[in-house]
């Protein structure tokens, strides 16, 4: 088996409680593209791969032997405000409203699985 072309050298791997609901969230907020879902015999998600904003994220369903393990994620995007609004509308909690920073337009929210999403438009020039 060869490495999928959408893999990058480093990718986040989260363990979430309620992986099917997490999929609905990332599809609604980021228009995430499904690449792979492998299910356990009980139909829970053993492993999933999705493309978010051009990059791959990987995750699986939490279990007794695999407790939830969230991650901070950074997205370089030109639509900071739009993604922030979509995150909040889909149950995330804002912890940095969209604002202009010396490094670009930025915002942040925490999803209900404990993942921190940082949104940044690095090409923004505040001058």
Spans of features found by a protein language model:
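Conserved short beta-strand elements that form part of the metal-binding/catalytic scaffold
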Residues: 34-70, 117-121
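Residue-level marker of positions within ordered structural domains that often coincide
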Residues: 17, 31, 55
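N-terminal beta-strand motif that seeds the catalytic metal site of vicinal oxygen chelate
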Residues: 1-24, 35-36, 71-73, 120-127
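Conserved active-site alpha-helix within GNAT-family acetyltransferase domains
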Residues: 20-29, 107, 115-116
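Vicinal oxygen chelate
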Residues: 1-5, 9-17, 38, 46-51, 59, 62-88, 105-110, ...
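Conserved acetyl-CoA-binding loop of GNAT-fold acetyltransferases
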Residues: 28-35, 91-93
């Amino acid at each position: 088996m060869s490495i999928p072309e959408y893999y990058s050298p480093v990718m986040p791997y989260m363990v979430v409680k309620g992986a099917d609901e997490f999929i609905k969230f990332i599809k609604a907020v980021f228009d995430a593209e499904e690449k792979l879902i492998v299910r356990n015999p009980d139909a829970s998600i053993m492993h999933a791969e999705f493309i978010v904003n051009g990059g791959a994220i990987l995750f699986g369903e939490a279990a007794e032997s695999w407790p939830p393990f969230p991650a901070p994620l950074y997205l370089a995007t030109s639509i900071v405000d739009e993604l922030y609004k979509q995150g909040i509308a889909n149950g995330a909690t804002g912890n940095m409203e969209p604002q202009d920073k010396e490094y670009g337009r930025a915002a942040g929210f925490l999803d209900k699985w404990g993942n921190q999403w940082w949104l940044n438009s690095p090409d923004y020039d505040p001058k």
